[in-house]
């Protein structure tokens, strides 16, 4: 069967996903799906006249199960996700007045991520024991940019990048 989901909310929040499940035979089945999420944001950066906390996120997943023999099961999963997010709606705090200013800074603070996860679960059922193996791989590439003085002045900012590949 197929599942389709669509939702909407305040502040331009939208989500949609579709997943299809299919049993091809007694020995093979799979599912495949994807999603998209959008949020326009709630907090405004007064200096840039843009919403700070927007979200664009999309991804997909494939899972397949194969039973080549009565004793052997192979379960493969592949997931991908991309995120593009704004963040950090902070305003400067004034001790003398006890008030926090509206967020207003010169650099847009963002987070971008590409993430791939794959795994292969292998299970062999012998007469007196079960042998299980899980093999996985993850690829992560992301970038964080942040205005750290939280003002219209160009004093402090950070950019952090990472790229990781993990095999287990």
Features from the language model and the residues they span:
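Membrane-spanning beta-strand positions in outer-membrane beta-barrel proteins
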Residues: 1, 29-31, 71-77, 123, ...
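N-terminal/domain-start segments enriched in small and hydrophobic, helix-friendly residues
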Residues: 1-5, 63-67, 124
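Extracellular loop and loop/strand-boundary signature of outer-membrane beta-barrel proteins
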Residues: 3-6, 44-50, 103-108, 117, ...
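Transmembrane beta-barrel wall of Gram-negative outer-membrane proteins
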Residues: 8-39, 43, 47-86, 114-118, ...
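Flexible loop and strand-edge segments within Gram-negative outer membrane beta-barrel domains
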Residues: 73, 77-116, 144, 154-163
């Amino acid at each position: 069967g197929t599942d389709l989901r669509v939702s909407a909310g305040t502040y331009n929040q939208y989500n949609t996903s579709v997943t299809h499940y299919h049993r091809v035979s007694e020995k093979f089945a799979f599912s495949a799906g994807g999603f998209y999420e959008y949020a326009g944001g709630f907090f405004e950066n007064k200096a840039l006249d843009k919403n700070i906390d927007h979200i664009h996120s999309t991804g997909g997943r494939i899972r397949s199960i194969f039973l080549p023999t009565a004793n052997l099961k192979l379960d493969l999963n592949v997931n991908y996700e991309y995120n593009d997010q704004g963040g950090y709606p902070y305003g400067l705090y004034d001790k003398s007045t006890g008030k926090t200013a509206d967020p207003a800074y010169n650099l847009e603070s963002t987070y971008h991520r590409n993430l791939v996860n794959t795994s292969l679960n292998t299970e062999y059922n012998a007469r007196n024991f079960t042998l299980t193996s899980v093999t996985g791989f993850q690829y992560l590439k992301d970038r964080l940019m942040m205005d750290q003085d939280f003002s219209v002045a160009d004093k402090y900012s950070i950019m952090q990048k990472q790229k990781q590949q993990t095999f287990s």
